[in-house]
């Protein structure tokens, strides 16, 4: 990266720090126009780039103090440029995430943790970039910096995954093997033993306390009975006018079809069980 381009990047980095700080302080007052919402929705696509680049950059920065690398102008310049690029991309991702957080359905402590750890990661990476050429910035400090950045990436990613996929997404295949054995039909409690497991498997990743899509929570009976933004979820004894089954039976390419395209779909048996429960 030539000096002029790097200087421009550094100026943009300063602007990002100020802009992100402003957004964090006034997030609750932020109202996005509809034409900016697609930018926020690019957050989940964009975030992979700064993760990969920051890990590579911070690793290269750690090893630049060896005799061979320290004397290699290309190595030192490339590691510096890579760190700048990764930090700038992290800034773009944070802005997108803050925009996305203003959309309906994102709420709760998990969102707050993801927002603040993500912002902290960006500020830490920015600080490392500005301090990396100080005389006291040597291998021990670089190692500590690498550890902090890596830990921040893991923590931020964990909360982001929880928002996207729900609690226990990674360990669910293992922990599910320890779930209590199937209850005999004659002893089953219909909601707790039949209906709730279906909702937990297919619906609660988007309809929980952390990610309240459509203002609908499906994690407990109170939320199910309350319904969401579109009204009651079902009418007992009347499957024809129940919103739950209406959305389930929509064509897969319909925007309001549930679960959304790309998510695990309800099986015919599960739909039949939900219909019988409503009746």
Language-model features, listed with the residues they occupy:
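Aromatic- and Gly/Pro-enriched helix-to-coil junctions and flexible linker segments
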Residues: 163-279
């Amino acid at each position: 990266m030539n000096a002029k381009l790097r200087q421009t990047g550094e100026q943009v980095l300063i602007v990002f720090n100020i802009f992100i700080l402003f957004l964090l302080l006034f997030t609750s007052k932020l109202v996005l126009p509809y034409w900016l919402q697609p930018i926020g929705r690019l957050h989940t696509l964009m975030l992979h780039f700064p993760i990969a680049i920051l890990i590579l950059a911070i690793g290269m920065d750690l090893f630049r103090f060896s005799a061979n690398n320290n004397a290699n102008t290309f190595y030192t310049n490339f590691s510096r440029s890579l760190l700048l690029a990764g930090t700038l991309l992290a800034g773009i991702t944070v802005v997108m995430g803050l925009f996305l957080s203003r959309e309906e359905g994102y709420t709760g402590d998990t969102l707050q943790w993801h927002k603040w750890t993500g912002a902290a990661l960006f500020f830490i990476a920015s600080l490392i970039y500005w301090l990396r050429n100080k005389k006291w910035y040597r291998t021990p400090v670089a190692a500590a910096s690498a550890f902090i950045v890596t830990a921040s990436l893991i923590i931020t990613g964990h909360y982001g995954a929880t928002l996207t996929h729900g609690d226990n997404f990674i360990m669910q295949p293992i922990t599910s093997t320890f779930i209590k054995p199937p209850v005999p039909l004659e002893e089953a409690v219909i909601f707790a033993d039949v209906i709730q497991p279906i909702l937990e498997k297919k619906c609660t990743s988007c309809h929980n306390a952390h990610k309240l899509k459509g203002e609908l929570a499906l994690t407990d009976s109170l939320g199910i009975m309350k319904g969401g933004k579109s009204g009651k979820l079902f009418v007992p004894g009347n499957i024809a006018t129940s919103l739950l089954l209406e959305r389930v039976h929509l064509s897969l390419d319909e925007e309001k079809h549930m679960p959304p395209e790309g998510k695990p779909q309800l099986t015919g048996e599960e739909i039949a069980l939900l219909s019988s429960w409503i009746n």
